Amino acid sequence: MAPQRRGPPRVPEGNSAAERRHANSTKKDRLPQEAQRTWLRIVALGVSLALVTFLLWSSAGIDDDVAEVVAHRGEVLEGRFIEVPCSEDYDGHRRFEGCTPRKCGRGVTDIVITREEAEQIRRIAEKGLSLGGSDGGASILDLHSGALSVGKHFVNLYRYFGDKIQTIFSEEDFQLYRDIRQKVQLTIAEAFGIRASLLYLTKPTFFSRINSTEAQTAHDEYWHAHVDKVTYGSFDYTSLLYLSDYLEDFGGGRFVFMEEGSNKTVEPRAGRVSFFTSGSENLHRVEKVLWGTRYAITIAFTCNPDHGIEDPVLT
């Protein structure tokens, strides 16, 4: 019998071949995992960048429907005035020749009230508001009527605190208040070409302190658009004296004149006076305060002596 031909004996598979196949298999499995990890890193980076951008945007108090800043915080304006057509709001009220607005507009100046005066009158606001304060984000102090925010309500600080008021405020405080009111009144009269003696202080004229605390009542919702002549029928000329600085003391909280397609905004600066006619030609709102505390005083004037109020007196 012829011998059977056999091939070379089968050698058992060595560890090296098995390891090569295992390595190839592992490498194939690893590729999708690495791609997934790379993708996740890209997504995480994108989210981080978006978050940083949002935080920077928010901290600056940017409002995306504001088209133009007419008064930057860093500017020191001798005077800037923008004339706009008067609305018909004044027609529904008794007119006073030589005072009722025929020239309408808005102005800003940084040279009427000094920063030192603004700091001094802010301390008056701080002393008064230390007696109370709203549970929400907006607190009011009215030295004329005595109205003070306390919790979710208002009290008359003169009746509520009685003789203690003499230890909180001084006659110098009230004299400074009167001096500043007079300076603002003269500024408005000059800008609109009317006699200052025809303007009467009217209510409400008040300090405001706004922070980012969530609103608790309708009185805390200061950010809604409104017209002063509609909200307060006595107003003919409105002014605001800012007592703190945008982006230093607070974020958000800018003043926005609302116009179709091109809003105009004023950035608060301590000592800055913003003033305007009170009709619908100056529809406006205040941005929500996002951080910090914003102080200001609203000083309103009327042409109707029947709606006039006296300067506050410390008695």
Curated annotation (Swiss-Prot):
Which residue positions carry a glycan here? N211, N263
| Location of the protein in the cell | Membrane
Topological domain, Lumenal: which ranges?
63-315
What residues sit in the active site?
A: R294
The entry lists its GO molecular-function terms as: dioxygenase activity; iron ion binding; L-ascorbic acid binding; oxidoreductase activity, acting on paired donors, with incorporation or reduction of molecular oxygen
Chief subcellular site?
Answer: membrane
Question: One Pfam match, by short name?
Answer: 2OG-FeII_Oxy_3
Q: For this UniProt record, give its keywords in alphabetical order, as a comma-separated list.
A: Dioxygenase, Glycoprotein, Iron, Membrane, Metal-binding, Oxidoreductase, Signal-anchor, Transmembrane, Transmembrane helix, Vitamin C
Region Disordered: which residues? 1-32
Task: Give the co-factor note.
Answer: Binds 1 Fe(2+) ion per subunit.
Residue ranges in the Cytoplasmic topological domain are 1-41
Transmembrane domains' residue ranges: 42-62
Question: What membrane topology does the annotation report for this chain?
Answer: Single-pass type II membrane protein
Needed cofactors, names only, are: Fe(2+); L-ascorbate
Kindly report, in one word, the top-level EC class recorded for this enzyme: oxidoreductase
Residue stretches making up the Fe2OG dioxygenase domain: 203-305
Could you name the domain of life of the organism this protein comes from? Answer: Eukaryota
Q: Name one GO cellular component term.
A: membrane
- Sequence positions that bind Fe cation: H226, D228, H284
| Signal peptide extent | none
> Which residues hold 2-oxoglutarate?
R294
Q: Where is the composition biased (Basic and acidic residues)?
A: 18-32
Query: Record's family?
Result: Belongs to the OGFOD3 family.
Q: What is this protein called?
A: 2-oxoglutarate and iron-dependent oxygenase domain-containing protein 3
